Amino acid sequence: MGIGISSESKESAKRSKELEKKLQEDAERDARTVKLLLLGAGESGKSTIVKQMKIIHKNGYSEQECMEFKAVIYSNTLQSILAIVKAMATLEIDYVNPRSAEDQQQLCAMANTLEDGSMTPELAEIIKRLWRDPGVQACFERASEYQLNDSAAYYLNDLDRIAAPGYVPNEQDVLHSRVKTTGIIETQFSFKDLHFRMFDVGGQRSERKKWIHCFEGVTCIIFCAALSAYDMVLVEDEEVNRMHESLHLFNSICNHKYFATTSIVLFLNKKDLFQEKVTKVHLSICFPEYTGPNTFEDAGNYIKNQFLDLNLKKEDKEIYSHMTCATDTQNVKFVFDAVTDIIIKENLKDCGLF
């Protein structure tokens, strides 16, 4: 009988030890788990950052995964040229090529009958001819006056490759593809001995009510704002400037009671498009009080300070900001490395080790 009790207590002690070990492992894993929330207005580049995490930290996209984006890429390309030709009527811009009016009619007819996400050789030729028309190019230059995908020129300039038989999208094609995010998308990866759980939440107004579910236990917020959106209006409300909306949103996030102790990193994104645009469109279109030089550096710093000045607790809370180009893998890799170092430093500070 004594032997039975002894082996039972041994078994119990063993179970207890295993449970203790598991609890310790869970606690260590939790301590190394970083919950990252990607927030920002619609079309600020959040989903592109998520794609970059897959490329940088999860072995990228396989050929099969790239092929899954083919229909999206064709759909983005078609929607872009349709948006431009539709805007030509609104902006009263004429075609230069006599054949273009007929091409436009054919384009619209084919768009209505073709299966979504497909590209026939005939359709590709029509799109190429229209894209070459100087009137279409003039309309494209005024893209901030209507809604057009940022990737329009990327795909339309490369239509020969994209429409070729046997086309397989590459990672850059995937990064430029655009699908509106609805709901919450979670991506997990490991880096610098940390386990990241990154949450991408739809940025358009109708999606924002879902954010509240993500707020608990957030380690760090990455807020994305498109620098190039300073002369653009919202898709969901054409009375509202996109930059003003972004500032309003950042203000509510930055000073929210939920995030009093949360690290906040500001990604001033689409710096490549901003650099191109700022030479043509003065920043005063968005900030009438701005009288400085319309250079990338001066105008970019002014926008950055507009965001940073919204922080009501500057003495307690530092906002870290980076100029980014979400489609540039090396840039995102460099910036995310810096963000991870901030997270590690903040964690050490919380533990009293820094």
Swiss-Prot record:
<dbReference type="GO" id="GO:0005737">
    <property type="term" value="C:cytoplasm"/>
</dbReference>
<feature type="binding site">
    <location>
        <position position="326"/>
    </location>
    <ligand>
        <name>GTP</name>
    </ligand>
</feature>
<keyword id="KW-0342">GTP-binding</keyword>
<keyword id="KW-0963">Cytoplasm</keyword>
<feature type="region of interest" description="G1 motif">
    <location>
        <begin position="35"/>
        <end position="48"/>
    </location>
</feature>
<dbReference type="GO" id="GO:0007188">
    <property type="term" value="P:adenylate cyclase-modulating G protein-coupled receptor signaling pathway"/>
</dbReference>
<dbReference type="GO" id="GO:0001664">
    <property type="term" value="F:G protein-coupled receptor binding"/>
</dbReference>
<feature type="region of interest" description="G3 motif">
    <location>
        <begin position="196"/>
        <end position="205"/>
    </location>
</feature>
<feature type="region of interest" description="G2 motif">
    <location>
        <begin position="173"/>
        <end position="181"/>
    </location>
</feature>
<keyword id="KW-0547">Nucleotide-binding</keyword>
<dbReference type="GO" id="GO:0046872">
    <property type="term" value="F:metal ion binding"/>
</dbReference>
<feature type="lipid moiety-binding region" description="N-myristoyl glycine">
    <location>
        <position position="2"/>
    </location>
</feature>
<dbReference type="InterPro" id="IPR027417">
    <property type="entry name" value="P-loop_NTPase"/>
</dbReference>
<dbReference type="GO" id="GO:0005525">
    <property type="term" value="F:GTP binding"/>
</dbReference>
<keyword id="KW-0479">Metal-binding</keyword>
<dbReference type="GO" id="GO:0031683">
    <property type="term" value="F:G-protein beta/gamma-subunit complex binding"/>
</dbReference>
<feature type="region of interest" description="G5 motif">
    <location>
        <begin position="324"/>
        <end position="329"/>
    </location>
</feature>
<feature type="binding site">
    <location>
        <begin position="175"/>
        <end position="181"/>
    </location>
    <ligand>
        <name>GTP</name>
    </ligand>
</feature>
<dbReference type="GO" id="GO:0050908">
    <property type="term" value="P:detection of light stimulus involved in visual perception"/>
</dbReference>
<dbReference type="InterPro" id="IPR001408">
    <property type="entry name" value="Gprotein_alpha_I"/>
</dbReference>
<comment type="similarity">
    <text>Belongs to the G-alpha family. G(i/o/t/z) subfamily.</text>
</comment>
<dbReference type="InterPro" id="IPR001019">
    <property type="entry name" value="Gprotein_alpha_su"/>
</dbReference>
<dbReference type="GO" id="GO:0003924">
    <property type="term" value="F:GTPase activity"/>
</dbReference>
<dbReference type="GO" id="GO:0050913">
    <property type="term" value="P:sensory perception of bitter taste"/>
</dbReference>
<protein>
    <recommendedName>
        <fullName>Guanine nucleotide-binding protein G(t) subunit alpha-3</fullName>
    </recommendedName>
</protein>
<keyword id="KW-0449">Lipoprotein</keyword>
<feature type="compositionally biased region" description="Basic and acidic residues">
    <location>
        <begin position="8"/>
        <end position="26"/>
    </location>
</feature>
<feature type="region of interest" description="Disordered">
    <location>
        <begin position="1"/>
        <end position="26"/>
    </location>
</feature>
<dbReference type="Pfam" id="PF00503">
    <property type="entry name" value="G-alpha"/>
</dbReference>
<feature type="binding site">
    <location>
        <position position="47"/>
    </location>
    <ligand>
        <name>Mg(2+)</name>
    </ligand>
</feature>
<keyword id="KW-0807">Transducer</keyword>
<dbReference type="GO" id="GO:0050916">
    <property type="term" value="P:sensory perception of sweet taste"/>
</dbReference>
<dbReference type="GO" id="GO:0007603">
    <property type="term" value="P:phototransduction, visible light"/>
</dbReference>
<feature type="binding site">
    <location>
        <position position="181"/>
    </location>
    <ligand>
        <name>Mg(2+)</name>
    </ligand>
</feature>
<dbReference type="InterPro" id="IPR011025">
    <property type="entry name" value="GproteinA_insert"/>
</dbReference>
<comment type="function">
    <text>Guanine nucleotide-binding protein (G protein) alpha subunit playing a prominent role in bitter and sweet taste transduction as well as in umami (monosodium glutamate, monopotassium glutamate, and inosine monophosphate) taste transduction.</text>
</comment>
<feature type="binding site">
    <location>
        <begin position="269"/>
        <end position="272"/>
    </location>
    <ligand>
        <name>GTP</name>
    </ligand>
</feature>
<feature type="binding site">
    <location>
        <begin position="40"/>
        <end position="47"/>
    </location>
    <ligand>
        <name>GTP</name>
    </ligand>
</feature>
<feature type="domain" description="G-alpha">
    <location>
        <begin position="32"/>
        <end position="354"/>
    </location>
</feature>
<dbReference type="GO" id="GO:0005834">
    <property type="term" value="C:heterotrimeric G-protein complex"/>
</dbReference>
<comment type="subunit">
    <text>G proteins are composed of 3 units; alpha, beta and gamma, respectively GNAT3, GNB1 and GNG13 for Gustducin heterotrimer for bitter taste transduction. The alpha chain contains the guanine nucleotide binding site. Component of the TAS2R14-GNAT3 complex, consisting of TAS2R14, GNAT3, GNB1 and GNG2; within the complex interacts with TAS2R14; this complex plays a role in the perception of bitterness. Gustducin heterotrimer may also be composed of GNAT3, GNB3 and GNG13.</text>
</comment>
<feature type="region of interest" description="G4 motif">
    <location>
        <begin position="265"/>
        <end position="272"/>
    </location>
</feature>
